[in-house]
Amino acid sequence: MRKLSFLDRVIEELDSYARFTKAPLNPSKKSPSSDTIDGKLSEVEKKHSAGLMRVDYTGEICAQGLYRGQASVAKSPQTKEHLYHAAAEEYDHLAWCGERLQELGARPSLLNPFWYWASFGIGAVAGSISDGLSYGFVVETEKQVMKHLDSHLKSLPMNDNRSREILKQMYIDESEHAVEAEKAGGKKLPKTVKAIMKLQSKVMTTLAYRF
């Protein structure tokens, strides 16, 4: 099998980015909201739900970038496979959030290209240091995503049943991903790194909700 050159890998990543940012996405599992009926939402409630789901969509864009960036420089084939598998599972979440945004008459964040490639760069730097650090980033990322999901579940309008079902399933999946990464040897990140990640997350959620 021919070893991919740097240019080959760049083209491969550009192709992957184009595929999962193109609507409609095709998840491997149907949306958890498929059999759920919404209550009546006011325009204000619909706008708020759309803002929350836009944040969650962008969070999944960041996860794709981080995991693919880590996988691109992973030290071992096992780590590379683990990360690409995690990215594939997160793709379903991306598709579910994208579908829900369309139902709410909203669009994804205009800043998603920036967040994807910024996350890809962070992932590549972490992955180039060690696989243990790479898994540590996965653990911390999933924990932060779970906090967002928990707050969004509490903030969703009472009648937004479809969004709620999606976020509940995402929370379960993210929890499993964090446990798997810890078992794979994820190292505990320094407090400074965690603080920077939280700050980046705060900026992302604030901007994605509005734009």
UniProtKB/Swiss-Prot annotation:
GO MF term set: 3-demethoxyubiquinol 3-hydroxylase activity; metal ion binding
GO cellular component: plasma membrane
Cofactor binding, note field: Binds 2 iron ions per subunit.
Binding site for Fe cation 1: E60, E90, H93, E174
Compartments (UniProt record): Cell membrane
Keyword Transferase included in the entry's annotation: no
Binding-site residues, Fe cation 2: E90, E142, E174, H177
Reactions accelerated catalytically: a 5-methoxy-2-methyl-3-(all-trans-polyprenyl)benzene-1,4-diol + AH2 + O2 = a 3-demethylubiquinol + A + H2O
Cofactor(s) the protein requires to work: Fe cation
E.C. number(s) listed in UniProt: 1.14.99.60
Pfam families, alphabetized: COQ7
Membrane association type: Peripheral membrane protein
Pathway per the UniProt entry: Cofactor biosynthesis; ubiquinone biosynthesis
Entry keywords, A to Z: Cell membrane, Iron, Membrane, Metal-binding, Monooxygenase, Oxidoreductase, Ubiquinone biosynthesis
Biological process according to GO: ubiquinone biosynthetic process
Source species, domain of life: Bacteria
Residue stretches spanning the membrane: none
InterPro entries: COQ7_proteobact, Ferritin-like, Ferritin-like_SF, Ubq_synth_Coq7
NCBIfam families cross-referenced by the UniProt entry: DMQ_monoox_COQ7
Physiological role: Catalyzes the hydroxylation of 2-nonaprenyl-3-methyl-6-methoxy-1,4-benzoquinol during ubiquinone biosynthesis.
Entries under PANTHER family matching the protein: 5-DEMETHOXYUBIQUINONE HYDROXYLASE, MITOCHONDRIAL, COENZYME Q10 BIOSYNTHESIS PROTEIN 7
Family of this protein: Belongs to the COQ7 family.
The name this protein goes by in its record: 3-demethoxyubiquinol 3-hydroxylase
Organism of this sequence: Francisella tularensis subsp. novicida (strain U112)
